[in-house]
Amino acid sequence: MFDFEYQLKVLPEKPGVYLMKNSSDEVIYVGKAKILKNRVKQYFQQSKNHSEKVRVMVSNIAEFEYIITDSEMEALILECNLIKKYRPKYNILLKDDKGYPYIKITINEDFPRVFISRTIAKDGSRYFGPYTDYSAVRETIELIKKIFPIRSCKRYIRDGQKPTRPCLNYHIKLCSAPCGAHISKQGYALIINDIVQLLSGKDKDILDKLKNQMEEASNSLQFEKAASLRDKIFAVKKITEKQKIIMGSFQNEDYINIAKDEKDSCVQVFFVREGKIIGREHFILEYTSDEREYKIIAEFIKDFYGGAAFVPKTVYVPDIEDKYLLEQWLTIRRGSKVEIKVPKRGEKIELLNLVKKNAKLTLEQFKIKYLQDKALYEVALAELSDILGFDDMPNRIEAYDISNIQGVDSVGSMVVFEKGRSKKSDYRRFKIKTVEGANDYHSMREILRRRFQRGIEEIQQIQKRNLEFSSGKFSVFPDLILIDGGKGHVNIALEVLKELNIEIPVAGMVKDDSHTTRGIIYNNIEKDISLDSNAMKLITRIQDEVHRFAISYHRTLRDKRVLKSILDDIPNIGTIRKKELLKKFGSIESIKKASIDQLLETPSIDKRSALSIKEFFAPNEL
């Protein structure tokens, strides 16, 4: 039993980080302190200043741990890392970093590529972001490829390597073909530099250059080239058309402000580069209404700039706690001095007020959509509860399906819906291991037994403190199981649950002859559901999703098997070489088209095996 009185007495009067845990050993809050003894004690003292959120959190604390650091700055850095690791329930969090796209430029390569990435790696690449609108980022990438003749292939191209035949993109002027030595490393670097400048908001020089080239082409009667350059100018303007000139001070500055309602907050960021607003992003922080605004902004800065690709010289905010400490931390992140400023007058405060207005509008729009969606989901779950005779709505629903073609590459899938919404982070896939041929019943038995047996084992490990709650992949059980199938499939599921001494209701999702969702079977009775009801729409969506997820995994396994079976017939190609070829080229078609030199770039492929591959696919060409 954790002795709170004793542990609070022995807390050190030093800086550090504290971790609050619940009865399941789950880390529910991470915080930093200049003096651990003073800060941690505050949570367990009666105070009117405690928000409702803090009171609820404290009621769930079963124990706490702490880590001593040499300074408050070290505590801040450690706090950021631990929050990123545990994603604690009561910390103010942005969506998982994986949800936000970045634009990545591989400037560490001889001939860099430009594409969308979900993560930042310390690989020497240049990143822009994070952005919240994936479709807008994708459109920007497509426009960049229209403006600049850069490569879109995934091949690794070295400067000075033997030239190969360019692809179609070169012939339609979408690529400068470094693979065929049609452009030097230095010439390609100039193109990449223009892209970096454009994404940084420095478009004036690019537009001037394109306009001069267009005039030269027009004067020399090269009208087709002039028209192409005109289109590129339009594309550049489309990328920058939302950029608004605001001030004469050419600084790299971010403006952060916040709007709140009775439940949630919206933090809006405006990015200013060279006197122009080059972009803005918003972040909805749910259940933060009782937090102080200056605290939310401080937490946001740690989370946002902890994963941001760029830290500006100046950050403007309406108010903030730990200002000087955060300035030091941002300075470390940037590599040069960063200031956090609270403007009181002039154009800076005017822009900050504009950011707040946008945050308020965004929050209102979010709330309207959220309430509409929430109402629909709640109605659907309420209808489903009535149909099944439940006292409470099923908060977590897990659905299962099996996919194979004539018993080959059998797979199972599990999708999860919480409060009516899909929760993709909890989706799981199963490769059938013990069943031969096409036997859906035995396959379903296998995946359900594996899923719930693993869940029981994880719960036991969590109870023994050998596993952190947040690390468990199967430890959360559903309120309802839906099986893609009829009575037979449902009975198989019930048998497995009975074997494991687990009580969870199971229903089957049945389809008619045209493969359209018809209804559900529960307690061996098919329930009549109106096709227009919200419950039917939810069931149909779940059934379509679990089927899609199973089919996609089945196709992946099938494609890998087909690739391997073809490569098995090539002399001198063993298991290791086969894996290396698939890793480098990805498809049989790419391997077929590869030159001897390209094949030799593959680890473990020597001249003899490269010749074997070429002879196998094109014996008449050697």
From Swiss-Prot:
Predominant location: cytoplasm
Keywords recorded for this protein, A-Z: Cytoplasm, DNA damage, DNA excision, DNA repair, Excision nuclease, SOS response
Q: Which GO MF terms does the UniProt record name?
A: DNA binding; excinuclease ABC activity
User: GIY-YIG domain: which residues?
Assistant: 13-92
List, alphabetically, the GO terms of the cellular component aspect: cytoplasm; excinuclease repair complex
Would you say which domain of life the source belongs to? Bacteria
GO biological process assignments: nucleotide-excision repair; SOS response
Give every UVR domain span.
204-239
How this chain assembles, per its entry, is:
Interacts with UvrB in an incision complex.
- Function according to Swiss-Prot or TrEMBL: The UvrABC repair system catalyzes the recognition and processing of DNA lesions. UvrC both incises the 5' and 3' sides of the lesion. The N-terminal half is responsible for the 3' incision and the C-terminal half is responsible for the 5' incision.
Q: Which family does it belong to?
A: Belongs to the UvrC family.
User: Protein name, please?
Assistant: UvrABC system protein C
Q: Which organism is it from?
A: Clostridium tetani (strain Massachusetts / E88)
